Design a protein with these regions (language model features):
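DNA major-groove recognition helix of helix-turn-helix/homeodomain DNA-binding modules
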Residues: 50-65
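Short amphipathic helical patch at the helix-1/turn junction of helix-turn-helix
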Residues: 6, 17-18, 46
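A detector for short, charged/polar N-terminal pre-domain segments
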Residues: 1-7
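Short basic helix-loop element that most often maps to the first helix and adjoining turn
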Residues: 10-29
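Recognition helix of helix-turn-helix/homeodomain-like DNA-binding domains
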Residues: 32-46
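Conserved hydrophobic/aromatic packing and binding residues within compact polymer-binding modules
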Residues: 12, 26-27, 37-40, 66
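Short, conserved catalytic or interaction motifs in soluble domains
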Residues: 42, 61, 68
Length: 68
C-alpha cells in the first residue's frame, strides 16, 4: 500500500488512542467492521473520502489533521 495510506492509518490510530478510544469504540461509532479499521490503521486498505470524512467527524478532527 502507498506511503500516504500508511501515514493516514498511523494518524488515525494515534488520534484515536489520544482520545482514549479503542478500535472497537471507533468502529461502533462508525458502524464499520473492526477488521476493516485494522487494515486501514495498518495501511493495508485505502478508505474512500467519504469514510475518511466519517472517521474525522467521529474523532472530532479535520480531514487535514488525519492527512498530516
Amino acid at each position: 500500500m502507498s506511503t500516504s495510506a500508511k501515514k493516514l492509518g498511523v494518524n488515525i490510530k494515534r488520534i484515536r488512542e489520544t482520545k482514549g478510544m479503542t478500535q472497537g469504540d471507533l468502529c461502533r461509532k462508525l458502524e464499520i467492521d473492526r477488521a476493516y479499521m485494522s487494515n486501514v490503521e495498518n495501511g493495508n486498505k485505502n478508505p474512500t473520502l467519504a469514510t475518511i470524512e466519517k472517521i474525522a467527524n467521529a474523532l472530532d478532527v479535520s480531514i487535514d489533521e488525519l492527512m498530516k
